[in-house]
């Protein structure tokens, strides 16, 4: 109402003269603001050209040609606009435009123009509505004629700027005109005010009449209210007062009864507190818990609300429950743990008196409580468990019990070590002094670890045995406590207190759940007795649709207690495992150097300890098992290293001479391979293929014929192993290992072997019915294999490692033997002058024996090896066995090669011998030039091999030797040029002697009328000498 007149007034002031000149009525200028008027108020944001170029401009409105656009920029101060004549438009020639020129423009703005027309139509309809209301707002319309300056809120002529705007200093005539204009403004305002008042006078008087009618009605309503109040007062006095008095008396009676109940409750609580103190002082925990249940039930409700005298009741109950928990906890700890102290004293006393508990690692009878003691333990623990369950403190008490139990175990072990160690150290030193090993030292200045290291293995086993018994006593007690708690909680055998236990579990479950919900992290629990559990039942049922929620909480609470109960025993077992492992770790450097029996006594005792504790604890002890496994592996590695060193030294000192086999080693074969049928040293003569009747009286050795022969043999032995392989490849097709093995079955050694056995005792080592001649290193290897088998049986967990070590030992033995014998290394390390056929034969016997026992050794070792490791280990053992077989065949090939070289040496000198046969015959030297040395060496080789090798091996070797003699001799004799008869006779004698020697050699080759060892030399003899014999006979 205030803003419109100033705006309209400014508009009227600026366009007043133009409106009067154009003769427009004042009503048109007083109409409501049109969109054009709104655009005037925002003239600063409009384009001036768009206003002046409005196509709808005419002689009406502000867009008339005589209207100035200066009014659009008018301010509150009236400024007379300047009058400008319209610009005359001049048409230029050729600027005539037609409608068709605007078709493109019209088509482009047709859509926008349509929207514009719709908007203008809507605006026109709104303008018509404003015109209908214009006569109602006449005052606002007339005020437009007065400048807006006079309607400002801060209008004051005292203000210089306002005065200068309203009354500018000018001439006298202008001042008179200004006074006339101001009077005119005042008249206009007064006139329209009167009009407005007259227009609104009817409504004023109508409203005044309505107010008078309202006043009359209010007076009537007040009178009616006074009448109603009087009526109500009379009704109260006559009808309600007596009933109200009765109600007040009844209320007083109820209040008095409630007061009496409160007083009795106060009396009960006071007496309960007194009784609670007495029960706690007398350690009657069950009765005290009943009272705390009632008191906490009262505290959980609102009966004691507002009683200032019981403001500390909750604290009293809390302290009482703490006291009850302390009593129950101490009694539980005393029954569960401290009763084992007497057993420790008895065990230590017995150990001190006897000095050794059990030297073989046997801990004696298993510690076990009697049935009566177990029943008594359950009866003693039952009230304590029920009480701790009711207070919901049993899980935390069991955790405390676990910590206390582990601490007691540590202290018991520490005390046992402290008491027994000085005694055992002194006895160990005395024992060492009595054996002259070292001087006596009391060990007073040594540390505990040093004292443990000074103990002998037997003393250390005694110490471990004492600790085992003490630990077993504690763990058995803990196990019985665990079983008793399980018996109580799980209602085993339906014991008499099952209902009480179930109620206590329910109370404890609710208490634990409540404590968890309200955020208790420790301290006393004061909000969950049996009464409260009963009162809490409706909310619990509200949380779950049935009683399953309470059952689930009870089940979970019981599970928590049982878990903590199990964890306590397992933690005690873990502590004992750690202490035991620490004791073993102190002596970790000593145990690998022990003997097998000493180490196994510690190992077996530890295994028994682990088994016993794991049985009690119910879980595997990974830490102590790892410690024991690492020490066992270190023991195996140390034993293997020492045996490898010993085996290398034995091989380097080996002279490759045959030795008698002590009964100890035959017993090793009998005990290790008992499943095989062993034969004794007796040999049936009928089963032997003897050739002693045809043997020549040969003397000397194979390598003692001449210096050239010895040098040749040494050169052969000093060749590398590659030469052996080559020669083996050349001869191996004629010597089949399979045929050798088939020929060995059921065959014993030669007759000379039997005679040596009678003279010197048992000279052969028998296995599977076959006797083997042995040297020192072979027996040492057998002893080592038996020790590895013992380790394998004693340490089955390391069976795979032991098998690998056995493979390494066998491979080293085979390689080193090949270097010493075939490679002639023994001539440097052992001082041998030469490698004789006897050495080769004995080496082959040792290699053959080892190769023969490998399958049975593998079977025994693999009995402990896991199935997953067997394929890989089988491949390794098969490779080693193959190496042994190849080595044996190379030795046989070397023996054949030696005989071949000796034959070629004799044949090489035969032409010179033939040249001397033209001289007169000398009967004493007829055969000593060629045949006699050759047959002598062949006979020596036959004798040596027959005494050492098996008959099948001898036959296989001499089959090749005979073949070589036949081939080489016949070829050489064929190429000889013999011109005289005497030379032919001598040659015949030599050939007959060689054939006689060949006939006496063992061989499985028989041809042409069953003549033994028939060959090319026989054919040569028949071809050259049988015809002559036939001619002479004729």
UniProtKB/Swiss-Prot annotation:
Description of how the protein assembles with itself and partners: Component of the Golgi-associated retrograde protein (GARP) complex, composed by VPS52, VPS53 and VPS54. Interacts directly with VPS53.
Family classification: Belongs to the VPS54 family.
Tissue spec. comment: Present in pollen. Mostly expressed in roots and flower buds, and, at lower levels, in vegetative tissues and mature flowers.
Annotated stretches, region: Disordered: 1-42, 529-548, 694-758
InterPro entries in UniProt: Vps54, Vps54_C
Coiled-coil parts of chain: 224-264
Lineage, highest ranks first: Eukaryota, Viridiplantae, Streptophyta, Embryophyta, Tracheophyta
Ranges of biased composition (kind: Low complexity): 18-42
Residue ranges, compositional bias (Polar residues): 700-710, 746-758
Domain of life according to the entry: Eukaryota
Cellular compartments annotated: Golgi apparatus membrane; Golgi apparatus, trans-Golgi network membrane; Plastid, Chloroplast
Protein name: Vacuolar protein sorting-associated protein 54, chloroplastic
Naturally occurring in which organism (per UniProt): Arabidopsis thaliana
GO biological process assignments: protein transport; retrograde transport, endosome to Golgi
Disruption phenotype: Lethal when homozygous. In hemizygous plants, male-specific transmission defect.
Any one GO cellular component localisation term in the record: Golgi membrane
Keywords: Chloroplast, Coiled coil, Golgi apparatus, Membrane, Plastid, Protein transport, Transit peptide, Transport
Membrane topology: Peripheral membrane protein
Transit peptide: 1-87
Task of the protein: Acts as a component of the GARP complex that is involved in retrograde transport from early and late endosomes to the trans-Golgi network (TGN). The GARP complex facilitates tethering as well as SNARE complex assembly at the Golgi. Probably involved in pollen tube elongation and other polar growth.
Biased composition (Basic and acidic residues): 711-720
Matches recorded under Pfam families: Vps54 (PF07928)
């Amino acid at each position: 109402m205030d803003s419109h007149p100033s705006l309209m007034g400014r508009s009227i002031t600026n366009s007043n003269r133009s409106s009067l000149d154009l003769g427009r009525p004042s009503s048109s200028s007083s109409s409501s603001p049109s969109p054009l008027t709104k655009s005037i108020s925002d003239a600063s944001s409009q384009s001036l050209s768009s206003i002046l170029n409005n196509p709808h401009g005419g002689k009406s409105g502000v867009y008339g040609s005589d209207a100035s656009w200066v009014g659009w920029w008018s301010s509150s101060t009236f400024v007379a606009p300047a009058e400008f004549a319209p610009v005359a438009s001049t048409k230029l020639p050729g600027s005539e435009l037609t409608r068709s020129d605007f078709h493109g423009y019209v088509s482009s703005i047709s859509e926008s123009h349509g929207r514009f027309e719709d908007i203008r139509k809507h605006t026109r309809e709104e303008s018509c509505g404003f015109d209908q209301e214009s006569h109602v707002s006449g005052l606002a319309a007339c005020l437009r004629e007065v400048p807006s300056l006079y309607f400002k809120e801060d209008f004051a002529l005292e203000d210089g700027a306002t005065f200068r705007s309203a009354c500018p200093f000018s001439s006298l005539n202008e001042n008179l005109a200004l006074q006339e204009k101001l009077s005119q403004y005042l008249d206009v305002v007064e006139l329209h005010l009167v009009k407005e008042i007259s227009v609104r006078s009817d409504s004023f008087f109508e409203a005044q009449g309505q107010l008078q009618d309202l006043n009359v009605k209010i007076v009537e309503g007040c009178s009616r209210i006074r009448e109603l109040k009087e009526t109500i007062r009379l009704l109260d006095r006559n009808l309600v007062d007596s009933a109200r008095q009765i109600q007040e008396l009844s209320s007083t009676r109820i209040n008095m009864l409630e007061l009496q109940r409160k007083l009795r409750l106060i009396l009960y609580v006071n007496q309960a507190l007194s009784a609670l103190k007495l029960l706690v002082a007398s350690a009657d925990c069950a009765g005290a818990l009943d009272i705390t249940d009632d008191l906490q039930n009262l505290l959980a409700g609102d009966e004691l609300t507002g009683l200032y005298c019981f403001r500390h009741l909750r604290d009293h109950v809390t302290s009482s429950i703490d006291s009850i928990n302390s009593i129950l906890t101490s009694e539980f700890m005393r029954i569960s743990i401290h009763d084992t102290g007497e057993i420790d004293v008895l065990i230590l006393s017995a150990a001190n008196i006897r000095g050794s508990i059990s030297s073989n690692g046997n801990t004696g009878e298993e510690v076990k409580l009697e049935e009566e003691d177990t029943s008594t333990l359950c009866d003693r623990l039952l009230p304590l468990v029920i009480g701790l369950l009711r207070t919901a403190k049993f899980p935390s008490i069991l955790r405390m019990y676990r910590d206390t139990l582990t601490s007691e175990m540590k202290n018991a072990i520490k005390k046992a070590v402290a008491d027994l160690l000085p005694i055992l150290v002194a006895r160990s030193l005395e024992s060492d002094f009595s054996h002259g090993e070292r001087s006596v030292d009391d060990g007073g200045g040594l540390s505990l670890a040093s004292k443990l290291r000074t103990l002998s293995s037997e003393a250390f086993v005694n110490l471990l045995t004492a600790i085992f018994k003490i630990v077993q006593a504690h763990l058995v007690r803990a196990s019985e406590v665990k079983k008793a708690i399980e018996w109580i909680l799980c209602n085993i055998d339906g014991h008499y207190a099952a209902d009480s236990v179930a109620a206590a579990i329910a109370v404890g479950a609710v208490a634990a759940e409540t404590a968890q919900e309200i955020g208790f992290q420790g301290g006393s629990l004061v909000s969950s007795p049996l009464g409260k559990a009963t009162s809490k039942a409706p909310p619990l049922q509200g949380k779950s649709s049935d009683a399953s929620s309470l059952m689930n909480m009870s089940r979970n609470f019981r599970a928590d207690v049982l878990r903590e109960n199990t964890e306590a025993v397992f933690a005690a077992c873990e502590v004992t495992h750690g202490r035991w492992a620490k004791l073993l770790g102190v002596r970790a450097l000593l145990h690998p150097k022990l003997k097998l029996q000493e180490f196994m006594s510690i190992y077996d005792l530890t295994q028994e300890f682990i088994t016993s504790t794991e049985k009690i604890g119910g879980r595997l002890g990974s830490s102590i098992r790892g410690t024991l496994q690492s020490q066992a592996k270190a023991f195996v590695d140390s034993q293997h290293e020492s045996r490898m060193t010993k085996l290398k030294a034995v091989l380097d000192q080996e002279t490759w001479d045959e030795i008698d086999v002590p009964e100890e080693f035959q017993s090793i074969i009998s005990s290790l391979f008992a499943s095989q049928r062993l034969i004794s040293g007796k040999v049936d003569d009928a089963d032997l293929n003897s050739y002693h009747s045809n043997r020549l009286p040969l003397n000397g050795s194979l390598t003692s014929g001449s210096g050239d022969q010895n040098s040749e043999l040494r050169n052969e032995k000093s060749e590398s192993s590659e030469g052996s392989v080559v020669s083996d490849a050349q001869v191996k097709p004629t010597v089949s290992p399979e045929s050798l093995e088939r020929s060995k079955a059921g065959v014993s050694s030669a007759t000379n072997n039997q005679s040596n056995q009678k003279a010197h005792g048992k000279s052969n080592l028998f296995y599977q019915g076959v006797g083997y001649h042995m040297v020192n290193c072979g027996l040492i290897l057998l002893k080592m294999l038996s020790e590895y088998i013992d380790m394998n049986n004693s340490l089955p967990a390391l069976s795979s490692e032991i098998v690998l070590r056995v493979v390494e030992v066998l491979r080293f033995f085979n390689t080193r033997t090949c270097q010493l014998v075939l490679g002639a290394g023994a001539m440097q390390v052992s001082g041998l002058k030469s490698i004789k056929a006897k050495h080769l034969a004995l080496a082959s016997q040792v290699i053959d024996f080892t190769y023969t026992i490998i399958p049975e050794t593998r079977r025994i070792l693999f009995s402990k090896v896991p199935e997953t490791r067997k394929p890989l280990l089988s491949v390794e053992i098969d490779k080693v066995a193959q190496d042994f077989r190849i080595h044996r065949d190379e030795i046989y090939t070397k023996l054949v090669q030696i005989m071949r070289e000796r034959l070629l040496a004799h044949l090489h000198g035969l032409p010179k011998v033939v040249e001397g046969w033209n001289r007169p015959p000398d009967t004493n030297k007829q055969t000593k030039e060629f045949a006699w040395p050759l047959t002598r060496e062949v006979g020596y080789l036959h004798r040596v091999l027959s005494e050492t090798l098996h008959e099948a091996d001898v036959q296989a070797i001499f089959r090749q030797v005979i073949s070589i003699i036949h081939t080489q001799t016949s070829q050489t004799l064929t190429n000889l040029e013999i011109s005289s008869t005497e030379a032919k006779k001598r040659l015949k004698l030599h050939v007959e002697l060689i054939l006689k020697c060949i006939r006496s050699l063992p061989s499985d080759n028989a041809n042409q009328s069953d003549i033994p060892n028939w060959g090319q030399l026989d054919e040569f003899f028949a071809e050259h000498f049988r015809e002559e014999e036939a001619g002479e006979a004729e």
